[in-house]
Amino acid sequence: MAVATALATATGAAAATSTTTAQQAADDLPEWGEVDSARLVPLQETGDPSERLNIVVMCDGYTAAEQDACAADVERNQNVQWSVEPFRSYRHYVNVYRLDIVSGGSGIRCDPDEEGGPDPDKVTPLRLVFSPGCDDPLARGVVYNNANGQGGGDDAGATPTGRQQHDFYLENYVAPELGIDAGAQNLQTLAVFNSFTYGGIGGTQATTSGGSPQGPLVSLHELGHSLGQMADEYPYSLRPTPGDPHPDREPGSFHHTRMTSQQMTDSQSKWFRWLGEESLSGGTIRAADPDGHESGATRGSDVWRPSEHSIMRWLGFHWDQVGREHMVARLTGQRNAGQMSLPSTPEGEVPRDGVVWVDTTQPRFHELDVTWRVGGPDGRVLDTGGARSLDLAGLDLEPGTVLHVEARDPVGPDGLDWVRNPSTNNTTTDSGYNGPRFVQTRQWTVGEATAPATPPTDPVVAGSPTDRPLAADEVASVQTAHPADRVIEVAWELDGRAVDGTTDRTLDLGSLDLAGGTHELVATVTDPAGGDPQTLTWAVDAVPPTAPRTLSPSLASVASDPDHGVWFDEFDMTLEPTDDPTGYDGDPYVVGEFRLDGDGWFNYFGFPEQEDAPFTFSHSGKVVKSLVYGSLGSGGMSKAAFEQEYDAGDPGGPFVPGFGTHTVEHRAIDPAGNVGEADAFDATVIPGAELECDRTVSGAVAGRLAVRSGTTCLDGATVRGGVSVAAGASLKVVGSTVSGSLSATGAEAVQLFGSTVAGSVSVTGTTADVTVVGSTLRGSVALTGNTQRQANERYSTHEGAYGPVLVGNRISGSLACSGNSAAPRDFGAPNEVTGSASGGCAGL
């Protein structure tokens, strides 16, 4: 498709209101580069727009000099979209276009985080504005401004409105190029606005931030609304406070309920087929049960959702099985069309020696089942190997014979198991794997006539996109011309070696078990009637992407595992998703993901509102604009801030801070769709804080060291003798070695991190803190009569008081603990004790 130019209205770079109308004549449109001009850039064309869902991504608030920034923002947005199922597998069911639009100024109206404050006078080509206006610091809905003053305050009577501008660009540019109506049901727009601030809104005219770390996730969430017809699952209408309880009636949303699992199963309604499954998004799929997931649909209580998390509740997670089942049906059925695309030989009578065909849209990672029958839908199955074309010449069928074909996407329980509803319907909430969104049939009658000979033709019509590499397990496909009297031939070569196709039009690369590296795949397409063969050539990316991690410095590593760090309260993780760029144009954007304690994969976007920041995990999370991120506590990483105050009896309560040991997995997904192998590490977070040093000792220390007052810190020190700590004094030992014994009587605090003590350790009567992490203690250890100050009241209230903290140490001698304020605790990182362990330490 050619790239067109000179589209849009003319407003002037600094104009506060538009002086033009949305019906401006095409010959008055400005040249590309002028304010309000536009151009359409195809990003992905997989088929006729009438047979696809078409996404048009529109740039707003980007000046002429910032168009490259919009292109980069859209690339990131789309690469994240293609990493999430079902978009990853059904990418070829979607066309994507970028509409570049030149704004007179940078950014949009009423951005609460704009430097210098929100600007009420800024006007962009699409009139986007943060709603409800410039006075709300938590504004996150970004809407097309209305001329009547709603949605940001255009002067009454000002024209055109944001919606008119939106329609203008579609009518004057997009619709003519795509050949579909500007209001077509299979046309989805997404306005990407130039801001680092989190925000967006749903509908068939969705919006999202271009620069926000979560911008691509906002648009996925909004597609859940507009494409998937899904409701919000979060527990509030206004962020700072819980939503009202749900009324005493069953919600209309297909993914909310007030029924118990038993009631749902008995009535065979909602998501009863998924009950009890481990959710893709965290937790176990439940209903309104004691262990169910209460709150959702902007209600704080008395309504239940299927899973602990999902992208419809907290951005970053994937759809759970219930949501994915509906999203895939909406994708394959072209939103409201309700039909899987299947161009074919026109139904009716066909020549007895002719060729009949169907053109299937190809999922990226699995084959469709194509079954040919003689005698109608219940007739004899022909052994065609899933061929898309059938030559009748060799079948010798009698005139009047009925020929039937079924194309089926095997999404049901016997295949992918993505759709468990067996219905034959295709409605929004009842689209089954036996329905027309996943199954299409065609039928012909064999006639008396023979097929006329046709001249040679260009054999290739389309195929898997060649402008980017294929994934190592992708199904490559070719779409050919369809002469009436013969079948176009397709031959495959991988790295110069002939390989057999999976069907007459496809090759499943996953069946070849490719070696690592970049390969070359060539399809040679030949018309038997003559003419030159045509070829399609792809790079095949068989290099798995990686996401190397960098963690903030720990107190120490567990003695038995150098990759298992221990931190007070929190730690940071930076991922650097990386892939081999061979075969790509430039350095591709690679998606990173991580998973906490097996609780659903989560998109790595850094940290909210902080450009290029690491992700912070902490015992109770960090609050950003009334939302919690990175919580290690009960209920998962993402929550509303008010949920952190919940106690027993509240939905999901009580909230318990996440001190203890956690497992974090992380991986990368490259633009080809390869999912790298996950790496993992354990991390232990303990309550407390490092002592602040009054005196620091490092290097060699000859003889015994006595700590008589204040806080003495040994940092990288080697003490040739023993160490003693007097009453009221404190000691912190970091990465040091003590050749003799360590004794403390009546000290305020004793902390050892990653250190070695060759002699015995005796700590008695400490008044505030005993914390020993990742250390090697070669003699006997005795902890007696110590008081451990509780660093987190909520944790101690719900999990019980803890005594001295002993985490991941290696103790060669005996370990004896008695008379402490509470039993010592290892917070999930056991100690290796060679000798006997007695008293309160018997379980360590």
Walk through the language-model features, giving the residues of each.
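Conserved aromatic beta-strand anchor motif in extracellular beta-sandwich/beta-rich domains
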Residues: V370-G376, W492-L494, F594-L596
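Extended beta-solenoid/beta-helix repeat architectures
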Residues: P687-L844
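Low-complexity, disordered linker/stalk regions enriched in Pro/Thr/Ser/Gly
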Residues: S344-T360, R364, P413-V490, R497, ...
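Secretory targeting and sorting signals
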Residues: M1-S18
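Propeptide-to-catalytic entry region of secreted or membrane-anchored zinc metalloproteases
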Residues: A25-G179, T207-P213, P413
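Active-site recognition of the HExxH zinc-binding catalytic motif
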Residues: L217-E233
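Surface-exposed, flexible coil segments in extracellular/virion-facing regions
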Residues: D378-L392, G496-L509, F607-P608
